[in-house]
Amino acid sequence: MVNKSILPALRLSMELTDVLTDIERAGIKISKGNLSQIREDYEKEYSSLYNDLMRIVEEVMGDTPINLDSPDDRSMLFYSRKVSDKAEWKKIFNIGFELRGNTKKQKRRTKMRRADFVRAVKDLAPVALKTVGTQCSSCRGLGSYRYRLKSGDLSKNKTKCKMCKGCGVIYTNVNQAAGLKLKPRGPEDTAAGGFKTDKETLEQRLLDLDGTAKVFAEKYMKYSKIRTYLNTFVDSLEKFQDEKGFIHPQFMQCVTSTGRLSSRTPNFQNMPRGSTFPARKAIVSRFNNGYILEGDYRQLEFRVAGFLSGDAQIYEDVKNGVDVHSYTAEIMGVDRQAAKAHTFKPLYGGILGNEKETRYYSAFKKKYLGVADWHERLQREAVSTKKVVLPSGREYAFPYAEFNSRGNVAGSTSIKNYPVQGFATADILPIALIKLSTLLRSIIKPAAKSVIINTVHDSIIMDVHPDEKDQMIYLLKEAMLCIKDEAHLRFGILFDMPIDIELKIGHDWLNLKEIDINDI
């Protein structure tokens, strides 16, 4: 265990509070015209994707109605099975929530042999069949009817048709399996109404799919993503604007378990990164011909894991500029873009997945032995002291950490994840923010017009006056690369892991061009 005082981390947090106050007051300028166009484009794409999806639904389900917003319907569509007894299903697979310690968590799924799992699925979730729909003869397709009273008048209230259950259509099974025929991997894929179809599960299973199933899954994930963009981000950017077209997000240091900043009104921390997210175009400079300047740490959490673990291979890879995503792609047998989602999962305790993912996680553990050994040390530390302490003095409590009968530690994923995420985004990034704020006040005379307007995970965003462009680029670079000296001053440690940053600038937050920092 590292014997450190928590005071340095506390001082850092107090100083950061002042900086965050300035960021909130400065606000972020929103272009109403850009935002309106973004909404229109999203809604067109959303409608087009919905139509494409429903054509595939009709192809694989026949006339069976499917509501894409229903987890039960999606389960039947993807896995071609429909649960006949939900209560028994939940009981067999131990689905639901329970109190563990003081926290309400999902129950751990039942462990069972593959053969037993397959048998249970066959018994409780028969294969779904395609259907043909015909108009209900009882209600003539209306779904309800009125009784004729003795007086000869029709009853005022409508009665739901029992024959068609109110839908106006009678669905008759045809002898053909419906759906996309995805096979569940085991109890971990079960959900209350069937099987999981959430984003994480579909991303994991995408490599197992082909043909129509893969096309549908890819379109559905994009459809779901755009719906989230509209309902969460576009709506929020419209809702929280003041009369001058600014939004003023609230930043919080005490919400996430790791100490990473969170924000609300709106929540910027969940916004997708980079040029793949058109809603960023709505964020513009408040100055005529002004700029949005963003500084982003490259692979910060990977480098932090190397520093905390002392892994010699990570130091070597960073020094030589190794493309770690290409290594992932090579091991998994996928393209580099697809590999990106998996590269750093082992840093956070990722060990399970499909065959390709498991192969990569195993290879990562063998390549980065220092990280693997460090993970073991963290678990032993958590079990023996009930906490993990960072070089900054920041502590994470794990009061329920114990080895179970299989040699695993309760909360092992958090034990491995919190130190990396915490030191990177709750210690290093705040150092850079505070340094930048100090430089803005002390070096620019009279006071700088440019302001810090946002921070998202390991990036810092500024609104830059056109007359201060070169100065702000220089100051942001200096602030983000000061970590070695500042970590020594604040925490008394030698942070010897090389840090690299990317600076980009443009007239809105979407259309940014990279700056060659060697020219600064």
PLM features per residue range, with description:
Residues L149-G152, L237-Q241, G274, I283, ...:
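Short, contiguous acidic/charged loop-to-helix segments that flank catalytic cores in large enzymes
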Residues S75-M76, Y145-R146, V169-Y171, T258-S263, ...:
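Flexible loop/turn segments at secondary-structure boundaries
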Residues M1-G274, N289-Y291, S362, H375-R380, ...:
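Conserved "right-hand" nucleotidyltransferase catalytic core of DNA-directed polymerases
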Residues Q250-D335:
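Function-dense linear segments that define catalytic or interfacial modules
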Residues D22-Y46, A305, I351-K356, I460-A479:
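Catalytic palm subdomain of template-directed nucleic-acid polymerases
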Residues D18, R25, T131-C161, V169-I170, ...:
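Conserved catalytic core of nucleic-acid polymerases
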Residues Q37-D72, F364-D373, D467-I520:
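Polymerase palm active-site segment centered on the conserved acidic dipeptide of motif C
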Residues Y297, D458-I460, I501-L503:
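A structural signal for short, well-ordered beta-strand segments
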